[in-house]
Amino acid sequence: MPKRVQVVLNEDILSLGKDGDLVDVAPGYARNFLLPFGKAVPVTPAVMKQVEHRRAKEVERQAALKQEALNFKTALDTIGRFTVKKQVGEDNVLFGTVTNGDVAEAIEESTKKEIDRRDILVPEIHRTGKYTVTVKLHSEVTAEINLEVVSY
């Protein structure tokens, strides 16, 4: 009996690897858990071809996502400034603070494209004025946008 067997994962497994990874596991782990539950398949030349094909498709998909992010960054740079209106008290101090949700709404109003608020890094904003906000569009693409906070 071999000490380790090679399998290709069909899904992400936290302690083992990601979908499509070639991993060495104990034969009992493969035989009793991974293979019966469809979480992995034994390594064969046909399976390896499928894995390579899947990886090539994933590389193409990531390249397309990166290009889309670069195009969106250009659109954000073209617009230039985004405005958020907040209620203001004395000395231009805001009631509350400007959140990444507020910035996401301002971007969506201007670009008509949805953006996840969790990808927006907003500094502490408690007064009206002009600020710089970082937007993560892709793992390799970030944009710096100008945000103006005004009273209404």
Curated annotation (Swiss-Prot):
Classification from the root reads:
Bacteria, Bacillati, Cyanobacteriota, Cyanophyceae, Synechococcales
One GO MF term on file is: structural constituent of ribosome
Q: NCBIfam families annotated for this entry?
A: L9 (TIGR00158)
What protein am I looking at? Large ribosomal subunit protein bL9
The record describes the protein's role as: Binds to the 23S rRNA.
Question: Family, per the entry?
Answer: Belongs to the bacterial ribosomal protein bL9 family.
Per UniProt, which keywords does this protein have? Answer: Ribonucleoprotein, Ribosomal protein, RNA-binding, rRNA-binding
One GO biological-process annotation of the entry reads: translation
Task: Write down the InterPro entries for this protein, in alphabetical order.
Answer: Ribosomal_bL9, Ribosomal_bL9/RNase_H1_N, Ribosomal_bL9_bac/chp, Ribosomal_bL9_C, Ribosomal_bL9_C_sf, Ribosomal_bL9_N, Ribosomal_bL9_N_sf
Its cellular-component GO annotations read:
ribonucleoprotein complex; ribosome
Coiled-coil portions: none
